[in-house]
Swiss-Prot record:
Its EC number is 3.1.1.96. Monomer. It catalyses: a D-aminoacyl-tRNA + H2O = a tRNA + a D-alpha-amino acid + H(+); glycyl-tRNA(Ala) + H2O = tRNA(Ala) + glycine + H(+). Its cofactor is Zn(2+). D-aminoacyl-tRNA deacylase with broad substrate specificity. By recycling D-aminoacyl-tRNA to D-amino acids and free tRNA molecules, this enzyme counteracts the toxicity associated with the formation of D-aminoacyl-tRNA entities in vivo. It comes from the Archaea. Residues 61-82 are annotated as: Disordered. This is D-aminoacyl-tRNA deacylase. Binds 2 Zn(2+) ions per subunit. Belongs to the DtdA deacylase family. One of its GO terms (molecular function) is zinc ion binding. Keywords: Hydrolase, Metal-binding, Zinc.
Length: 254
């Protein structure tokens, strides 16, 4: 798999990650603007786009995350196009999550106190023609500068890329996860239990249009849709299930 590692000069966590990745001999494509404000035309062609990035939240909780970019609604205030999502590689996202968790639990890193989780689809860029993922250090400036946090992600990234390039990973069902909160706790747990390769994730609060449902089921390879049954409003459940049934798309409660 050909891949492009991308770092933004505006992002301190991204620059921290870039330093560590380059220390291992990997090349990084540098951009001058925010990663979320970029688009497909600004990058060389690749089979996978991997953005080295910060994660910000009001809680400032130490968190390491991985997610695919995309806007599930008309709101594109954080880059990208309205109601558009970039393609997703569920194997990459899940192996990356598992590897971050593995390193995070090692004795030399455990005291840092980081959580490891997925995030749902959000922000740009949304028009990429190949799978993409953001790998992130969060959630405040203090964490963005931590070398050991960058080392966890760098080692996880190297292990993930090596596994994919050498086809050294087990065959498992690939799923799309619908429902739950922003950090998708249900699907994070399923992935860490190594039950599935989890790709696209959407939250309870997003009202998914037919346009988005069509993109979810056409831009990622998947075996079935996993529905967090308690993590959706009843009205939305009925709408989504009706769409899946009408289009012969397999789904399961999880």
């Amino acid at each position: 798999m050909d891949y492009l590692l991308i770092s933004s000069e505006t992002d301190p966590a991204s620059q921290n990650l870039k330093k560590h990745v380059e220390n291992y001999g990997y090349s990084v494509f540098n951009i001058e603007k925010k990663s979320t404000q970029t688009n497909y035309s600004e990058f060389p062609q690749s089979e996978m786009y991997i953005f080295l990035s910060k994660h910000a939240s009001e809680s400032k909780k130490p968190t390491l995350t991985v997610h695919t970019p995309g806007n599930l609604t008309d709101d594109n205030s954080h880059g990208g196009n309205p109601e558009e999502i970039s393609p997703c590689n569920p194997v990459f996202n899940t192996l990356m999550l598992q590897n971050m968790n593995k390193y995070n639990e090692m004795e030399e890193y455990k005291e840092l106190g980081f959580d490891v989780s997925f995030e749902v689809l959000h922000h740009g860029p949304t028009d990429l023609k190949a799978p993409s993922a953001f790998v992130e250090i969060g959630s405040s400036e203090e964490q963005w500068q931590i070398d050991d946090a960058a080392e966890i992600i760098t080692n996880s990234l190297i292990d993930t890329l090596n596994s994919i390039q050498n086809s050294e990973y087990d065959e498992k069902e690939k799923i799309i996860g619908i429902g739950g909160g922003h950090y998708s706790p249900k699907f994070t747990k399923l992935a860490l239990r190594e039950e599935y390769y989890v790709g696209y994730l959407t939250p309870k609060h997003a009202k998914l249009s037919e346009n988005i449902l069509n993109q979810l089921t056409s831009k990622q390879e998947f075996d079935f849709i996993g529905i967090d049954w308690k993590g959706l409003y009843g009205e939305d459940k009925r709408k989504y299930v009706e769409f899946f049934d009408e289009n012969d798309i397999s789904w399961q409660r999880v």
